[in-house]
């Protein structure tokens, strides 16, 4: 989806310096509820702009699910436990 790429491009314009400079946000909506994934981002982004972009994307995703009768695995996607700043990029550490 173009909207998701817009979000990723927006985030890529910012960097972090350490793990405490990173955060996450739920992105996408599974057909049976809950987020599709979590997106990590540096705290240096304008969080109201990011929230608006993500809210729009999540609503589009939800509407797409309804219109297409989409199904999913319904597995719970949990927030990341470990986020680090790797070479200026917020990264989920497994």
For each of these PLM feature ranges, what is it?
Residues 1-20:
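Acidic/polar, low-complexity intrinsically disordered N-terminal segments immediately downstream
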Residues 6, 34, 67-69:
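Generic preference for well-ordered secondary structure
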Residues 20-59:
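Mature extracytoplasmic domains of secretory-pathway proteins
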Residues 49-75:
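Short cationic/low-complexity microdomains
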Residues 65-94:
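Short flanking/linker segments adjacent to small metal-binding domains or redox-active Cys/His motifs
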């Amino acid at each position: 989806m173009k909207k998701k790429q817009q979000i990723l491009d927006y985030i890529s314009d910012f960097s972090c310096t350490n793990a405490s400079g990173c955060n996450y946000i739920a992105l996408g909506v599974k057909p049976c509820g809950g987020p599709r994934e979590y997106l990590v981002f540096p705290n240096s982004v304008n969080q109201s702009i990011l929230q608006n972009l993500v809210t729009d994307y999540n609503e589009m995703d939800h509407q797409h699910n309804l219109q297409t009768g989409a199904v999913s695995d319904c597995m719970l996607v949990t927030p990341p436990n470990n986020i680090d700043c790797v070479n200026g990029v917020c990264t989920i550490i497994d």
